[in-house]
Regions:
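Gly/Pro-enriched, hydrophobic low-complexity segments
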Residues: 20, 24, 48-51, 101, ...
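Short loop/turn motifs at secondary-structure junctions and domain boundaries
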Residues: 63, 150-152, 173-176
């Protein structure tokens, strides 16, 4: 084998490797996610039950599985109610478009956070300032698909599979520090039915899984259900912003 042929083989091998490492963004997967995001964005109201499981690293036990269940109600651009039960305790998040109330059923304590933003903007600011988590919030962001594409190394449509008895589009992807999978209902509404995230940059690769059930589209949700009425003897506490590292 002469030098020219050796050089050709070497360069060809490099090109094959480079092609193999190139990001793969499946247009079918993007189209499904775009459709889901557009439908959710057009909803005037909705409700859904979210069951989540997540891993926490233990020095003695390795990954320990925890779980929570949430009932979420969304109305218009600025009303949200989330009732949560599970390993993180029992609490309620209630937003009436003017004030977010965090109520701990376990401690019978509540705190108030003033806000007059849309639900999405409120979630974003409250999460950054106070570290409060809102289940399923990612799917309600109008930039959901753009955010996924911005960090994805790969995004592919795998095929049709089932979540419970529901046929779903199965989509999987990878990013720098995680892998993720979405199951989107194969029907007229294209609603999220399940998601799994594996944090590959963290010790032991902890996972987060959420299953969405009991979707109700555009239900009649009265404004009164988003108003918080303090239970008897409930104590009002001050909400303390988390320390931001410089």
């Amino acid at each position: 084998m002469n030098k020219k042929l050796l050089l050709f083989v070497f360069i060809g091998a490099m090109n094959i490797k480079a092609i193999g490492q190139a990001p793969k963004i499946d247009t079918v997967a993007v189209s499904i996610l775009d459709r889901m995001s557009a439908i959710i964005g057009d909803l005037s109201s909705c409700s859904v039950t979210i069951k989540s499981n997540y891993d926490i690293n233990s020095r003695e036990l390795g990954l320990v599985k925890h779980s929570n269940e949430h009932e979420l109600y969304l109305h218009g651009p600025n009303k949200l109610l989330v009732k949560s039960e599970g390993d993180k305790g029992s609490h309620i998040l209630s937003y009436n478009g003017k004030t977010l109330t965090y109520y701990s059923r376990d401690k019978n304590q509540f705190g108030l956070i003033p806000s007059q933003a849309s639900v999405v903007d409120m979630i974003d600011s409250v999460n950054k300032m106070y570290g409060i988590e809102f289940p399923g919030a990612d799917f309600f962001y109008p930039t959901f698909v753009d955010d996924i594409l911005a960090e994805s190394k790969n995004l592919v449509f795998i095929g049709i599979t089932k979540v419970g008895d529901k046929d779903c589009f199965h989509i999987a992807g990878t990013a720098k520090d995680k892998t993720f999978q979405f199951w989107i209902s194969d029907d007229a509404f294209y609603l999220p039915m399940k998601m799994v995230i594996v944090h590959t940059a963290k010790e032991n690769n902890p996972q987060f899984e959420a299953v969405f059930t009991n979707w109700k589209i555009n239900p009649d949700l009265p404004d009164a259900m988003f108003e918080f009425n303090a239970p008897p003897n409930a104590k009002k506490i001050k909400m303390v912003a988390k320390t931001i590292k410089k």
